[in-house]
């Protein structure tokens, strides 16, 4: 069985992202896979590339051939150089920022302004400047006022 390391496309129209997978060369692009060894998100800036290096090395060692696109990603991460026997392969991919560090406060916390310790929160009874519900506007005709 001829095994290939290739990209499986997932995502929306015009918003693709890929999984780097090991699959039989005769299967469809998005068909059944043997194993997923990584992810690639080209739309992000900078592009997100994550490859499980030990698993990629294993599949390369047993004869899996990468496609051109997968080979380019393996070269960027340094896995291809490691497979070819270089002593100190260098990854040109930036390490991803942790998700927790990039998150900000939830929307509910961002919307509410912090209240000072001595300051009271305004209530409905404190708002005497607003018209009450019982006030009838003067521009409403007489026949409509009586119906309400």
Curated annotation (Swiss-Prot):
Family from the record: Belongs to the bacterial ribosomal protein bS16 family.
PROSITE patterns reported in the protein's UniProt record: RIBOSOMAL_S16
Gene that this polypeptide is encoded by: rpsP
A single GO molecular function term of this UniProt record: structural constituent of ribosome
Name of one Pfam family that matches: Ribosomal_S16
Descriptive protein name: Small ribosomal subunit protein bS16
PANTHER family in alphabetical order: 30S RIBOSOMAL PROTEIN S16, SMALL RIBOSOMAL SUBUNIT PROTEIN BS16M
SUPFAM superfamilies membership: Ribosomal protein S16
């Amino acid at each position: 069985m001829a095994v290939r390391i290739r990209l499986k496309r997932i995502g929306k129209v015009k918003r693709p992202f890929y999984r780097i997978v090991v699959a039989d060369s005769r299967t469809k692009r998005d068909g059944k896979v043997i194993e997923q060894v990584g992810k690639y998100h080209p739309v992000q800036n900078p592009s997100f590339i994550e490859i499980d290096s030990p698993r990629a090395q294993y599949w390369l060692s047993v004869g899996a051939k990468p496609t051109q696109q997968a080979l380019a990603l393996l070269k960027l991460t340094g896995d291809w150089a490691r497979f070819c026997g270089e002593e100190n392969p260098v990854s040109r991919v930036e390490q991803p920022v942790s998700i927790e560090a990039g998150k900000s406060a939830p929307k509910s916390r961002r919307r509410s302004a912090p209240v000072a310790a001595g300051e009271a929160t305004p209530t409905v009874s404190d708002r005497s400047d607003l018209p009450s519900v019982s006030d009838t506007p003067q521009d409403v005709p007489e026949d409509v006022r009586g119906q309400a």
